Amino acid sequence: MRLRNKPWAEDYLRKHNTVVDLDGTHAGKMSEWFEKDQPIYIEVGSGMGQFITELAAQHPEVNFVSLERDKNVMIRVLDKVLEKDLQNIKLICNDAMELTDYFKDGEVDRVYLNFSDPWPKKRHAKRRLTYHSFLALYKAILKDEGEIHFKTDNRGLFAYSLESMSQFGMYFTKINLNLHDEDDEDNIETEYELKFADKGSRIYRMEAKFH
């Protein structure tokens, strides 16, 4: 997601302690980020933040981390955090390839990947967040029973992700081929999901673990 550049975005983000890091200086200091020692769920690519802020509001017993590389997008997430007065969420403005610089091995309980860029061209496959190099990062930071929760409206990306994860040695604990037809009461919709669902698009979802 790209928004018009806001020259003031970085200064705005630095004013709030909810934003943990803009330059890597807090990397590997998870214990200092949160007041409570609780399970850690992260969302890679949070968009406008509707999903993760609603999830954090519903689950104060969990610590959440939003990873978003675009400062212009991250300010939207921060605004929602401040509006809801959430104390159990922190924001990181950086790329997913830097995950292991922020989290220690086995430190994370769950990773959310919601409506990631499908990068449909084959030559761009390595940019997909379910490409094997990204899966290796998730495996490093997740606990032994840690999970990846994945949602998309893109059938091609979903099929690719199932194959990529299987080849990487993962197994699936849940697969939904038409999420909104299954009336999942626990489902929290993202901004993209609402838009696609209103158009009648099918939403694909799965949960996976590493062997």
UniProtKB/Swiss-Prot annotation:
Catalyzes the formation of N(7)-methylguanine at position 46 (m7G46) in tRNA. Keywords: Methyltransferase, S-adenosyl-L-methionine, Transferase, tRNA processing. Transmembrane segments: none annotated. Pathway: tRNA modification; N(7)-methylguanine-tRNA biosynthesis. Belongs to the class I-like SAM-binding methyltransferase superfamily. TrmB family. Substrate binds at K121, D153, T190, E191, Y192, E193. The keyword rRNA processing does not apply. Its EC number is 2.1.1.33. GO terms for cellular component: tRNA methyltransferase complex. The keyword tRNA processing applies. GO terms for molecular function: tRNA (guanine(46)-N7)-methyltransferase activity. It catalyses: guanosine(46) in tRNA + S-adenosyl-L-methionine = N(7)-methylguanosine(46) in tRNA + S-adenosyl-L-homocysteine. It is an enzyme of class 2 (transferase). The active site is at D117. S-adenosyl-L-methionine binds at E43, E68, D95, D117. This is tRNA (guanine-N(7)-)-methyltransferase.
